[in-house]
Amino acid sequence: FGDNTFVAVGVSGKIVRSTDNGETWDNASSGITTTIRDVSFGDNTFVAVGYSGNIVRSTDNGETWDNATDPVSGTIWVVGFGNNTFVAVVHGGWILRSTDNGSNFSKVVKPGNHLTGVGFGKNTFVAVGPYGGLYRSTDNGKTWDSGISVNPFGTSERFDSVAF
């Protein structure tokens, strides 16, 4: 949600937007044909991520979309925003970062676990994955703590999402 605009994303590069609290929706062209998995808003910019390493961004409330520089070819699961930084996590474990409103993303670290969620709160990014992986950054995604154990009972835990 940005500037009174909702944006929804889905299969086949589908992007729709609503400027009237979801009462009506208009199609927007993403320019891609693969599934878009997630969208985030920050600094007056929507960033959407998905299959085949696709990253698209919009600075006009989702009306038009441009390709961003994407350094990976795998599925980008989710993207989050905080402190003027977009952070995305990739199937296979890469964490990506952008500090220029989503124009260019760079690889930061590959923790080794598959990651499926990222959240931001209190100046901290947290990334999670389905094999008990939990990673933390307190410097806007520049560096990440190695896996933090969140498995106190010795069982196999699956984490898919995180929010603050």
Describe each region flagged by the PLM:
Residues 1-164:
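Residue-level hotspots at or immediately adjacent to binding/recognition sites across diverse folds
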